Structures are given as C-alpha cells and as structure tokens.
C-alpha cells in the first residue's frame, strides 16, 4: 500500500534542496564551512521547520555548534530567500540543529570493530 505524502513532507523536501544550494552559494561566513542538510521536519501547519545539519570536516563538536549558531543567526535571511524561491506566501520559521547521528553511528561502528577484533583474538588464543 503506498504511503501518503502530506504537503508538509513535500515542502520539507523542497526546503532541504533549496537550503543546501542557498547556504553554499549565498551565505558568506568563514565559520560555516561545508554544511550538509541531513533532514528537514516541517510541522503540519507549515509554521516551523527544524533543519538538522552536519559540518563536513569539523574536527570537534564545538566547530559544528558554531556553524549551527551562524545558521540560526542567518535564519531570517534564509527564510526570505526560500519563500521567494518556493513562491510561498510565508515560509516556515527555520531552526537549525546539529545532527549527531553520523558521529554516533561512527562510534557504534568503532565499538563493533573492536568487539569483533577482541573476539577474533580470543578465539586465536584458545586455538593455540
């Protein structure tokens, strides 16, 4: 059975594509770096959009948090550009959040790799 797509889902996808382009081309802040828009959640009434981002090449989480603060300060400008681009009468209010899922996934992968290596070492030690 096909899943229904609500208008808010379509708007979220359009905002994600638009933000990815606008942030790279029109936001000129050296603290920003290369930003990935991971997902956008828009409320059903289209009044608020939560934008989850990661910063490529950020060595520490604090660098990503600085980028999120820069994006939140530029939210009004970005909202205006998106409203014009998507020809919306009023665009949702944008709130940016650092998406920790990539970091958590990498940490989990490292834990699994260490557990597999320890298990392999243990089985080799028992085999001798």
Curated annotation (Swiss-Prot):
Keyword Cytoplasm on entry: yes
Keywords for the protein's UniProt record, in alphabetical order: Cytoplasm, Ribosome biogenesis
Keyword Coiled coil: no
Subcellular location: Cytoplasm
Family, similarity comment: Belongs to the RbfA family.
HAMAP family in alphabetical order: RbfA
Protein name in UniProt: Ribosome-binding factor A
Species, as recorded: Saccharophagus degradans (strain 2-40 / ATCC 43961 / DSM 17024)
